[in-house]
Structures are given as C-alpha cells and as structure tokens.
Amino acid sequence: MTATNHPKLFKRPVDGVLLLDKPGGMTSNEALQRVKRLFHAKKAGHTGSLDPLATGLLPICLGEATKFSQFLLEADKSYSVKGRLGVRTASGDSESPILTECPIPKLTKRALEKTLFAFRGVIDQTPSMYSALKHKGQPLYKLARQGIEVERKTRQVTIYELTLLDWDNESIELYVHCSKGTYIRTLLDDVGEALGCGAHVVALRRLRVAHYHEDQMIKLAHLEREYDKANYTGLDRYLLPLETMVSHFPAIKLSSSTAFYLQQGQAVMVPNAPTHGFVRLRDQNDQFIGIGEILSDARIAPRRLIQKR
C-alpha cells in the first residue's frame, strides 16, 4: 500500500523545504497533499500556485518551514512559456473556450523584439477572471465558470527579463523573469493583442523561485518510487534546511542571553547589527533560530522563530 492511498497515516513533525517539480495535469494543492502524505507530515503548505497545465518548481514547506513561506511568495520568479498565436481564449490558456481567432501576420524577429520591449520593466496587468483572486470572498475562477464577470483592478508588476527563445508561423516561446503577482497567461494574452492576432498559453514551466532553481527540483514520481512505508524518514534527504528560504538576509550571531530574551518575544540590542530590514538569527551554537527585524531604535525584534524539536 502506498502513502497516497493509506487510510490512516501516521503523521510526524518534519521540517524542511522540498523543491517539487510539479507535473502537468495536477493542481498545486493536489501535489501538496501527495507530498504531505509521502513525508507523513503533520503540517505542509506551498508558496504560490501553479496552474494545472503548468509544470516546474513548486516549493513545498513542511512543518516550521511554513513560517517563512511569505518570503518565497514575495520573491521573483522565472518561467519558460510557449504560446499559440492567432487564438485567444477565456482563461488565456488551452483549457478554456476560444474567444477569437485571427489571422497571424508575418512576424519577423525585429517586429517581435519591438513588441516585447514594450512589456519589459514596470507594467500594468488586469488579472484574468480565471485566477484565484477573490471578489467578496469568492474566487474569480468560480465566478468565471458561472459566466459571471466582475471588474478587476489593474496591478503593477515588473518584468525584469522577457526574452524571445523561438517562434514560427503558429507559436512563440519566451523566457520571463518577473516580480511576484505576475500572471503569465495575462502577459501572453497582452503580447498576443499587441501583435494583432491574439495568443494563449499551451505550455508553462516555472524555472526559478528566488534563488531556488530548476536543477534542484525533485520529481513526484521519483519520491513515490523511493517511498518506503517502513522508513518514515527515508525521503528526508530531499529536504532543504529552513534557513535556505531566507539566506538572502544577513546573519546575526547571538549570545546565549540575547537568544533567550528574543525567544521570550523581547526586542534586544545586538552590537554591529545592520541598521534596517530583516536578519537571520543564529544562537550561540550557530544554529538558525528564526528571523528578526531591525526596529527604528536599532533593536532587533523577533518576527518568525522556529520551534526546537
């Protein structure tokens, strides 16, 4: 019997980050639940949904790692995306009804580059009705499936890099490095409109989240092959330490007394600390204990502290 169909599964406290290569045809929550069962984890969460059509990097946070998920939710992300030209759909991908079909103009690399140039930098996006954003507590995609459309506010996002990888008479492939909150389906839909023919996503792969990258990903099928119900900890070797989630923040080593007071919820003074922002907190044994924030009076306040097992 596998972990995915076991009726009464033993659950344990386990901490770490799994860089899952989400397969296509599966929701992010379905992938999360599969991983949670494989690791027999009491607590798990992911850091930003991928569409069912999409594949690629889906960081899964187990146990205490969930306390730091916001830092990955807010991080830059990178994708490769393939779009079909000449067809615009309701959701911006191939899994919804066609809205319009238009002839595709003769495209040159120069014309494509000129179009893409306009989408680099800070741009405004109007989220698709087929998104997880909520209107009066109801996800937009549920309203869209009922044929209901509501007004959505535009949002500013940043496209740091938008590179033409390939194109032919029917399709276009792009590399996108973008800020949090960017809808790739919306981006491709807007690019298609700018080209005068419309476009929609037929393949999407997330390559990077913050400093985590494609080469670090683990496939779900590999985890399922490696799973051993007699050894609950066997898959733990694939987990990354919690501290890797916040490695971009400077580290502060604390004395035993300072660490004690911080863990009691008190702000403390630390010599030679940075003047602002978040910091990684390490105790007198150089063990990661959480995240603190520099206050205006130069003290460090605890923000996310991990529970010692």
Curated annotation (Swiss-Prot):
GO terms for biological process: mRNA pseudouridine synthesis; tRNA pseudouridine synthesis. InterPro entries: PsdUridine_synth_cat_dom_sf (IPR020103), PsdUridine_synth_N (IPR002501), PUA-like_sf (IPR015947), PUA_sf (IPR036974), tRNA_psdUridine_synth_TruB (IPR014780), tRNA_sdUridine_synth_fam1_C (IPR015240), TruB_C (IPR032819). It comes from the Bacteria. Its EC number is 5.4.99.25. Keywords: Isomerase, tRNA processing. GO terms for molecular function: RNA binding; tRNA pseudouridine(55) synthase activity. The active site is at D51 (nucleophile). Transmembrane segments: none annotated. Gene3D superfamilies: Pseudouridine synthase (3.30.2350.10), PUA domain (2.30.130.10). It catalyses: uridine(55) in tRNA = pseudouridine(55) in tRNA. HAMAP family: TruB_bact. Responsible for synthesis of pseudouridine from uracil-55 in the psi GC loop of transfer RNAs. PANTHER family: PSEUDOURIDYLATE SYNTHASE TRUB1 (PTHR13767:SF2), TRNA-PSEUDOURIDINE SYNTHASE (PTHR13767). Belongs to the pseudouridine synthase TruB family. Type 1 subfamily. This is tRNA pseudouridine synthase B. It comes from Coxiella burnetii (strain RSA 331 / Henzerling II). The gene is truB.
